[in-house]
Amino acid sequence: MTDLTLIFISLSGNTLSFVRRLSQYLAEKHHIQTKTINIKELHHETFPVMESFVAILPTYLEGGNGIDSGKVEILTNPLGDFIAAHDNVKHCLGIIGSGNKNFNHQYCLTAKQYAKRFGFPMLGDFELRGTNADIERLAQVIVARLTADQQS
């Protein structure tokens, strides 16, 4: 059995719902046990993470369109601080973004910014709470990434 940590921040409950369902799916279908860390519950505390993890980040940005304005992250910054602290970034397999497609260019923009900032891949995205198809699709991506990481 393989272990994986999912590090995320959930403000409205959508990301938490997705993480719970993804964890259950990974356990049942791929025999991967997950440990979850909701950064919101840490109250800006950081600590070293020594195992491989996937970051999951909802999109909260200042107003705007994501092109000319509205590119500045709000509310979810503690996840970036956690990844940057203690060289945790070296254990991150990649990031999954979530958002609302009604926001067009801002959809999952924060996750794309993290991928560029930290140099890890954007593994995928889902809208709002995600669908069962999103769970299956992203689980496959995670399994492939975890397998590649373990073989290197």
From Swiss-Prot:
GO terms for molecular function: FMN binding. It holds the Pfam family Flavodoxin_NdrI. GO terms for biological process: protein modification process. It comes from the Bacteria. Belongs to the NrdI family. NCBIfam families: PRK02551.1. This is Putative NrdI-like protein.
